[in-house]
Amino acid sequence: LNARYNALTSISPNAEVSLDNTQGLGRGNIANDGLLTLKNVTGELRNSISGKGIVSATARTDVELDGDNSRFVGQFNIDTGSALSVHEQKNLGDASVINNGLLTISTERSWAMTHSISGSGDVTKLGTGILTLNNDSAAYQGTTDIVGGEIAFGSDSAINMASQHINIHNSGVMSGNVTTAGDMNVMPGGALRVAKTT
């Protein structure tokens, strides 16, 4: 482990750094313009990431992104069987997400998400906060589980939600103007407050 390492790590274009532990690069910032691969990693990644490269979660990785990644404009890739979780907007920065695994968003605050989220993976909403999606952030095709708080659609025109299955759990809420592509299951205690669904 490099837990005491506290210097900047720079990943150049066409270069790759592969980690099998969240403390593999210590506590320092990561300037990623290449490829940072998390391979069979579990735990909290507290490093702050910047740059325009790719962060790839592979081989059953399950990582919580805790760093201030506000300056990261690259891409998070979540492979099948892997998972990333975030709590705040700064954890995703301005990056896009290709999600073929599981993305968990646990927020206690309101968050208007403008990130592009695509892929066949699932999204789980936890926490009491309101997560507002647009067409780009609602482009993923996997299952949506609203376990806590609310997923809202704030546009005057209907947002196209590509998710094939939507589960609104007890205390979960879905609201706004939305056109859905798949089936919807509102469980006891869940609430659906939408202007339009198909």
Spell out what each predicted region is.
Residues 1-34, 39-52, 64-101, 106-120, ...:
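Surface-exposed loop/turn positions within long extracellular repeat scaffolds
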Residues 58:
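Residue-level recognition of the GNAT/N-acetyltransferase active site
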